[in-house]
Amino acid sequence: MDYDEETNSIGFEDFVDDVVENKSTEYPDLKTVVIDTYDQLVEIAKPEVIRMHNAENPEKPVKSIKAAFGGYMAGEDKATEIVLNKLWELKSVGVHFIIIGHVKQRTQDDVTTGQTYTSLTTNMSMRDF
């Protein structure tokens, strides 16, 4: 979640830490950060969750987010938690955030009335949407 060797660039966590630490000196005019896209940011966090689990539980290493922290969505919940915590750190120094997410229309039929209606959905987990 921190560093991309291919592009030689810092990641989301390093960026947030830098802004929080140096807001008044390096980023005095920074007001808003745009996250494009939230679903991708959560995907980026998943390997970090696996790393965290394996560091805390060396006797029971996992390779999958679904197995991390005991399973039953605990790994996915941890990914969401660390992303949101970083976003709230930005907010704590006065930097707001705009989150972009991909949505798509889905046509459904009401089982009771038989009427067709359209709803918005996403590729993300409904827990995050």
Show where each model-derived region lies.
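Well-ordered, non-membrane alpha-helical segments in soluble/globular domains
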Residues: 10-18, 73-84, 119-129
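Catalytic-core regions built around general acid/base machinery
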Residues: 82-93
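Phosphate-binding/switch region of NTP-binding enzymes
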Residues: 96-129
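Basic, amphipathic N-terminal segments that precede the first structured/catalytic domain
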Residues: 1-32
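Walker B catalytic acidic pair
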Residues: 37
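A solvent-exposed, charged loop/short amphipathic helix patch at secondary-structure junctions
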Residues: 45-78
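Loop/turn-to-beta-strand initiation segments
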Residues: 27-32, 93-99
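Catalytic P-loop NTPase motifs of RecA-like helicase/translocase cores
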Residues: 41-42
